[in-house]
């Protein structure tokens, strides 16, 4: 991958119509397509109180983001120096990827900030009146068919099995599971009447809130959380601006917006632990 690919990368301008005369500086975030909705929302909020800043997003898969940064930094043609790179922040989706970037020093150690957790939620069609109100209640509702992601094929299914097993429910409901190949199929099975309830990730459920409703949310601490973090790219061109944005994504205003989108706020303990240099 050539470094020039990054220099000429296509970025997406976010929502506010800020005139070039007002927006004098860009803040570029490299992120994965799966993180588009929350990172866009954070960017818009930040622009509202920083009219001189235009937040732009560069999209690629987490693995390709890592490769692109590596190519940019290791190329003898396109080497950057501290404070001169094209990327400010990195939000690849999932802390495993961002930890790998830390190990390679592609992001600055000590700058990782968790901003969202991804809960599992139980959903039902809007028309269903007598719905269970907890995951544990699934064991008692012996006639309910449950749409879940296939644990052998999907992360959603693996997380669902882990949660229900930890709660002591999996063995009681396994014969009633309608296993689907992806999130879209879980929704289709539920809305087509092939299942009575479904289990999804919170953000996916919120996007379908006009057709389904959430009746239960997994509690923190039952299974290891899925955490999304953001960190400063090693050659970030404006560290003060990056630090301000990293602080903003953990603010009450930002967290309220993320909860509206179906995410959970990282625990205060998680934030403190990851904020240590």
Predicted features by range, described:
Residues 6-17:
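Bacterial N-terminal signal peptides
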Residues 1-4:
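Positively charged n-region of N-terminal signal peptides that target proteins for export
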Residues 22-50, 54-73, 77-88, 92-277:
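Exported/periplasmic ABC-transporter solute-binding proteins
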């Amino acid at each position: 991958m050539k470094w020039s690919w990054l220099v000429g990368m296509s970025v997406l301008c976010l929502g506010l119509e800020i005139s070039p005369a007002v927006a004098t500086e860009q803040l570029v975030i490299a992120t994965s397509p799966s993180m588009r909705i929350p990172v866009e929302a954070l960017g818009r909020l930040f622009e509202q109180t920083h009219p001189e800043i235009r937040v732009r997003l560069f999209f690629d898969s987490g693995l390709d983001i890592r490769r692109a940064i590596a190519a940019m930094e290791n190329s003898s043609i396109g080497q950057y120096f501290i404070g001169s790179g094209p990327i400010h922040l990195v939000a690849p989706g999932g802390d495993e990827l961002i930890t790998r970037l830390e190990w390679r020093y592609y992001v600055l150690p000590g700058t990782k900030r968790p901003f969202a957790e991804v809960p599992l939620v139980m959903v039902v069609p809007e028309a269903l009146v007598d719905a269970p109100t907890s995951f544990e209640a699934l064991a008692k509702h012996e006639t309910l068919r449950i749409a879940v992601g296939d644990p052998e094929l999907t992360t959603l299914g693996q997380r669902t099995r882990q949660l229900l097993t930890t709660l002591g429910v999996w063995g009681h409901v396994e014969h009633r599971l309608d296993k689907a190949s992806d999130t879209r199929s879980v929704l289709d099975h539920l809305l087509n009447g092939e299942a009575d309830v479904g289990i999804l990730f919170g953000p996916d459920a919120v996007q379908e809130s006009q057709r389904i409703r959430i009746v239960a949310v997994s509690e923190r601490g039952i299974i290891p959380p899925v955490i999304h973090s953001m960190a400063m790219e090693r050659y970030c061109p404006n560290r003060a601006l990056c630090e301000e944005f990293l602080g903003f994504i953990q603010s009450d205003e930002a967290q309220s917006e993320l909860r509206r989108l179906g995410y959970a706020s990282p625990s205060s303990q998680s934030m403190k632990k990851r904020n240590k240099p």
